[in-house]
């Protein structure tokens, strides 16, 4: 047994499924973060959704999985500096979940769909690396079954220990991935869009692979305001159409202010069943420095008094957006104090629609805010 409390199991279960209708048939990779809850914590939490019993495994495979998870849960001290415990939990540690969600039409099922998620749990906030890993593992697992998971477990056992500041090479189902690990809270330079299959172009482990310039496509002029809010520990609610969009947005905001640590708590994908829901949402005033990513429109009503609310769009040209696409906007109660770099912004607005310029534009934008934070 891995020593996961009932509260953590509930959180893992609810966090691993989109809290919105994303598509009829398709898959989605996203990430989330939940607080570790001590095993002796109160059991007063929402019930987890019913799930079929997991397939039986041989003792050797179970033992191997325990060892592989111990690697994925290693190096807690290299995680982003966390806030003090809140309300229900006495823990200051977090679990990161990297999820592959699959949905297919299936008329034989009561709801008409086959829906399952495969999740990698880790104490390491390496969103860039683990998104690449789960994106390879998920499709293979759902096509070939447990034999893929067993092969992956044996791969993980052979992974070297993650050393901050170095490039890590790991095998994933026959593919060798190279990832540049951050040195503490230092910013990682580059565009963050590499697949990691080349040692000369490694994955930036702490940076989402979806470009910053694409995630905030319609809101590029507002990045200066968001950067300022992150530095001054202002509460921010981010609402998007799916958990990949919101989780990438939150991760990018965390990356935007490196090497300054996040002053409060951040949740890339947050839902109403989270163990800390009351601590964040039902208070008269939101906690200082908390950043929540959500897909449920319920949060727009419940958190209407928050000082900064971001609604994300599709991340592409208006001509490609349908009627149901939400209008991208930021509602903020404070006045921006930092001046925009209008020259850079004008250039970014030209680059964002050019596929050949996307990598360069993303690298320039990330470098700009890294330098701005260092001043």
Residue ranges of predicted features:
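Acidic, Ser/Thr/Pro/Gly-enriched alpha-helical scaffold modules and adjacent low-complexity linkers
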Residues: 1-375
């Amino acid at each position: 047994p891995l020593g996961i409390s009932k509260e953590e199991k509930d959180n893992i279960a609810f966090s691993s499924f989109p809290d919105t209708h994303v598509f009829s048939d398709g898959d989605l990779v996203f990430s989330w973060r939940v607080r570790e809850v001590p095993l002796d914590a109160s059991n007063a939490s929402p019930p987890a959704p019913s799930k079929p019993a997991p397939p039986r495994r041989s003792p050797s495979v179970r033992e191997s999985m325990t060892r592989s998870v111990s690697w994925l849960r290693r190096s807690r001290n290299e995680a982003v500096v966390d806030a003090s415990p809140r309300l229900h939990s006495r823990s200051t540690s977090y679990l990161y979940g990297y999820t592959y969600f699959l949905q297919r039409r299936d008329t034989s099922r009561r709801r008409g769909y086959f829906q399952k998620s495969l999740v990698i749990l880790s104490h390491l906030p390496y969103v860039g690396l683990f998104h690449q890993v789960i994106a390879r593992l998920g499709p293979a697992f759902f096509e070939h079954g447990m034999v893929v998971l067993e092969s992956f477990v044996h791969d993980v056992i052979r992974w070297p220990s993650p050393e901050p500041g170095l490039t890590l090479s790991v095998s994933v189902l026959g593919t060798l991935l190279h990832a540049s690990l951050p040195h503490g809270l230092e910013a990682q330079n580059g565009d963050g869009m590499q697949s990691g299959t080349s040692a000369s172009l490694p994955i930036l482990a702490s940076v989402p692979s979806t470009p910053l310039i694409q995630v905030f496509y319609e809101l590029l002029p507002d990045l200066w305001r968001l950067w300022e809010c992150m530095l001054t520990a202002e509460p921010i609610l981010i609402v998007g159409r799916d958990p990949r969009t919101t989780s990438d947005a939150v991760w990018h905001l965390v990356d935007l202010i490196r090497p300054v640590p996040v002053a409060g708590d951040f949740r890339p994908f947050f839902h109403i069943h989270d163990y800390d829901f009351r601590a964040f949402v039902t208070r008269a005033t939101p906690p200082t420095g908390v950043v929540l990513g959500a897909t449920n429109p319920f949060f727009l009503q419940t958190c209407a008094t928050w000082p900064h609310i971001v609604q994300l769009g599709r991340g592409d040209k208006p001509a490609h957006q349908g009627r149901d696409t939400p209008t991208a906007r930021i509602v903020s109660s404070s006045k921006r104090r930092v001046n925009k770099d209008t020259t850079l912004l004008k250039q970014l607005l030209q680059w964002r629609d050019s596929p050949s310029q996307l990598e360069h534009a993303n690298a320039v934008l990330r470098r700009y805010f890294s330098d701005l934070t260092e001043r």
